[in-house]
């Protein structure tokens, strides 16, 4: 994931910062508890494609 892109990309819902999870290949919004997938190096910033996360629980690379 390009560091410059990470500096400017925000959550499409709350416009807050996203955190890159390299192992899961996801961008995480802690405020909304959503994880946006990265497919072929491209962030998929569609709410319908995001999955719910649970704070304090490791992100599952399989997306469950």
Curated annotation (Swiss-Prot):
Signal peptide: none annotated. One of its GO terms (cellular component) is cytosol. It comes from the Bacteria. Gene3D superfamilies: 2.20.25.10. Pfam families: Trm112p. Belongs to the UPF0434 family. PANTHER family: PROTEIN PREY, MITOCHONDRIAL (PTHR33505:SF4), ZGC:162634 (PTHR33505). This is UPF0434 protein Bcen2424_2546. It comes from Burkholderia cenocepacia (strain HI2424).
């Amino acid at each position: 994931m390009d560091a410059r892109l990470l500096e400017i990309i925000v959550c499409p819902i709350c416009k807050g910062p996203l955190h890159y999870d390299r192992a899961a290949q996801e961008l995480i919004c802690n405020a909304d508890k959503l994880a946006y997938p990265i497919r072929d190096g491209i962030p998929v910033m569609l709410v319908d494609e995001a999955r719910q996360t649970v704070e304090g629980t490791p992100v599952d690379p399989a997306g469950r």
